[in-house]
Amino acid sequence: MIVQLKNIINDIWKRDKMSLVDTSWLENNINKVKIIDCSWHMPQTQRNGFEEYTKEHIPNAIFFDLDKNSKLDTDLPHMLTDPKSWEKIMSNMGIENNDEIVIYDNSDVISSCRCWYNLIYYGHDPKLVHVLDGGLKKWKKENKTTDDKKVITKTSKYFS
């Protein structure tokens, strides 16, 4: 029984191991990937992910607004938008279908995983979409470089 469980866990690890990347991997590949900051905070925290992003983010990171980039005509928060809207959002962010992407957040609500799910749902290759283990908190704890520069992106053509 324990051997079977270990084999199942190993199979899952082999299949999905690139979904989570560590800070050293990102630091070594920072100019080879697109980086998305998807920080979102519960309203009662009175924190604003975008304001925090403008003050400090991982170099080259593009901000993804989880509120604005979700379906807006519903009372339920953060519902998936329609495919055409998703294509426009990604295209405006300069994301292309073959881009390797690392997503992180600066929150305790794992909003980066929501963005990861959206990308996979709309057809981005799961092997090209990663979540940064520990997010911005771990990045800063390890004294890695942060930035406050506005990232300028070229519009791309993204297809879902």
Model-derived features: where do they sit?
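Aromatic- and Gly/Pro-rich amphipathic surface segment
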Residues: 54-93
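Conserved beta-strand scaffold positions in the cores of enzyme catalytic domains, especially
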Residues: 35, 61-63, 129-131
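Anionic group-transfer/hydrolysis microenvironments
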Residues: 39, 67, 107
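Thiolate-centered catalytic microenvironments shared by cysteine-dependent enzyme domains
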Residues: 77-160
